Curated annotation (Swiss-Prot):
Residues making up the signal peptide according to the UniProt record: none
Organism: Homo sapiens (Human)
Protein's UniProt name: Zinc finger matrin-type protein 4
Pfam families the record matches: zf-C2H2_jaz, zf-met
Gene Ontology cellular-component terms listed: nucleus
Compartment(s): Nucleus
Region (Disordered): 116-135
Matches recorded under SMART domains: ZnF_C2H2, ZnF_U1
Disulphide linkage map: none
A molecular function GO annotation: identical protein binding
Keywords: DNA-binding, Metal-binding, Nucleus, Repeat, Zinc, Zinc-finger
SUPFAM superfamilies referenced in this protein's UniProt entry, alphabetically: beta-beta-alpha zinc fingers
Zinc-finger ranges (Matrin-type): 14-44, 72-106, 145-175, 198-228
Length: 229
């Protein structure tokens, strides 16, 4: 039995014996024979069951270019190392994304050139320069790897910059700034209590955040109680 007869027996319009797949419609048949899973199983099958030198596509890749020109393109694609059971499957492959992508890489690698022309890459260095702007007593030399204020680690400088530009870090930095301002007027005991529960002992009121506490200190009620104390 010839290898072509064996291939036709393995890959029919209604069933793929290599993958044990039932093919109901033409679209399902084309999609299956075009899939990477099918191609991988076919290569593995020919490795385990070599006939007439193995898979035609594999055999032709080891030969010179002049021999490859004599290959029937409706039976195999030497560029993608794939074999076909019919002209319909072959035509679908040549019009598909996988073949087009590999053909572009072979002819001149146009895809990498497009990525270098994008304006995204030159925008990254200026954003990196804005990282040291964040002033904090928790700032460390390796601030592009760790934020002591938020106890956050970073895998790269871009991730660090996104953190410093985020709401969470800015909110924590604002709290630290307020605590530093209040620290000049409060003693250490009051400051420690403030860090825990934001309570004003003069007005006997508890607040939910440092921002509310700071606003309360500037309010008329607190100022009146402070004068009457």
């Amino acid at each position: 039995m010839k290898s072509s007869d064996i291939d036709q027996d393995l890959f029919t319009d209604s069933y793929c014996k290599v993958c044990s797949a039932q093919l109901i419609s033409e679209s399902q048949r084309v999609a299956h024979y075009e899939s990477r899973k099918h191609a991988s199983k076919v290569r593995l099958y020919y490795m385990l069951h070599p006939r007439d030198g193995g898979c035609p596509a594999k055999r032709l890749r080891s030969e010179n270019g002049s021999d490859a020109d004599m290959v029937d393109k409706n039976k195999c694609c030497t560029l993608c190392n794939m074999s076909f059971t019919s002209a319909v499957v072959a035509d679908s492959h040549y019009q598909g994304k996988i073949h087009a992508k590999r053909l572009k890489l072979l002819l001149g690698e146009k895809t990498p050139l497009k990525t270098t022309a994008t304006p995204l890459s030159p925008l990254k260095p200026p954003r990196m320069d804005t990282a040291p702007v964040v002033a904090s007593p928790y700032q460390r030399r390796d601030s592009d790897r760790y934020c002591g204020l938020c106890a956050a680690w970073f895998n790269n400088p871009l991730m660090a910059q996104q953190h410093y530009d985020g709401k969470k870090h800015k909110k924590n930095a604002a709290r630290v700034a307020l605590l530093e301002q209040l620290g000049t007027t409060l003693d250490m005991g009051e400051l420690r209590g403030l860090r825990r529960n934001y309570r004003c002992t003069i007005c006997s009121v508890s607040l939910n955040s440092i921002e509310q506490y700071h606003a309360h200190l500037k309010g008329s009620k607190h100022q009146t109680n402070l004068k009457n104390k």
